[in-house]
């Protein structure tokens, strides 16, 4: 589970990201992000995940993917630029990704959006 300050839960924030967020796309994920409203400077970035039924009709598979993404994001949260809201939306082919591919996809999108304070080393395949 992501630490509480890094979780994006507000419905209005999700809607604002869908409507006005900047978009970066990868092969298996879409990243929507935008700065937090004025007065929220210095607050840690918040991350939300969307795993729709297009990914899989099985809730078990969707929840497993959600847990995997959270575990990839957990150590990255302190390295995110403060003051942003992020939303990761999965594409249907993301279920086929192995762990190293999934890590690389998340890192690639965060670097593409220039949201990492210090670039973390590329994940090593295990």
Curated annotation (Swiss-Prot):
<protein>
    <recommendedName>
        <fullName>Ribonuclease P protein component</fullName>
        <ecNumber>3.1.26.5</ecNumber>
    </recommendedName>
</protein>
<keyword id="KW-0378">Hydrolase</keyword>
<dbReference type="GO" id="GO:0042781">
    <property type="term" value="F:3'-tRNA processing endoribonuclease activity"/>
</dbReference>
<dbReference type="InterPro" id="IPR020568">
    <property type="entry name" value="Ribosomal_Su5_D2-typ_SF"/>
</dbReference>
<dbReference type="InterPro" id="IPR014721">
    <property type="entry name" value="Ribsml_uS5_D2-typ_fold_subgr"/>
</dbReference>
<dbReference type="GO" id="GO:0001682">
    <property type="term" value="P:tRNA 5'-leader removal"/>
</dbReference>
<dbReference type="InterPro" id="IPR020539">
    <property type="entry name" value="RNase_P_CS"/>
</dbReference>
<dbReference type="GO" id="GO:0030677">
    <property type="term" value="C:ribonuclease P complex"/>
</dbReference>
<dbReference type="InterPro" id="IPR000100">
    <property type="entry name" value="RNase_P"/>
</dbReference>
<dbReference type="GO" id="GO:0004526">
    <property type="term" value="F:ribonuclease P activity"/>
</dbReference>
<keyword id="KW-0255">Endonuclease</keyword>
<dbReference type="GO" id="GO:0000049">
    <property type="term" value="F:tRNA binding"/>
</dbReference>
<keyword id="KW-0540">Nuclease</keyword>
<comment type="function">
    <text>RNaseP catalyzes the removal of the 5'-leader sequence from pre-tRNA to produce the mature 5'-terminus. It can also cleave other RNA substrates such as 4.5S RNA. The protein component plays an auxiliary but essential role in vivo by binding to the 5'-leader sequence and broadening the substrate specificity of the ribozyme.</text>
</comment>
<dbReference type="Pfam" id="PF00825">
    <property type="entry name" value="Ribonuclease_P"/>
</dbReference>
<keyword id="KW-0694">RNA-binding</keyword>
<comment type="subunit">
    <text>Consists of a catalytic RNA component (M1 or rnpB) and a protein subunit.</text>
</comment>
<keyword id="KW-0819">tRNA processing</keyword>
<comment type="similarity">
    <text>Belongs to the RnpA family.</text>
</comment>
């Amino acid at each position: 589970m992501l630490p509480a300050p890094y979780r994006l839960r507000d419905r209005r924030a999700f809607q604002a990201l869908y409507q006005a967020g900047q978009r970066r796309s990868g092969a298996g994920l879409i990243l929507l992000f935008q700065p937090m409203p004025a007065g929220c400077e210095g607050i840690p970035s918040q991350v939300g995940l969307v795993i729709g039924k297009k990914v899989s009709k099985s809730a078990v598979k969707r929840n497993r993917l959600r847990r995997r993404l959270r575990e990839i994001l957990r150590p990255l949260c302190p390295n995110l630029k403060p003051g942003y809201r992020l939303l990761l939306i999965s594409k249907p082919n993301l279920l086929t990704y192995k762990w190293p591919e999934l890590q690389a996809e998340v890192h690639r999108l965060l670097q593409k959006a220039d949201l990492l304070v210090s670039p973390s080393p590329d994940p090593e395949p295990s």
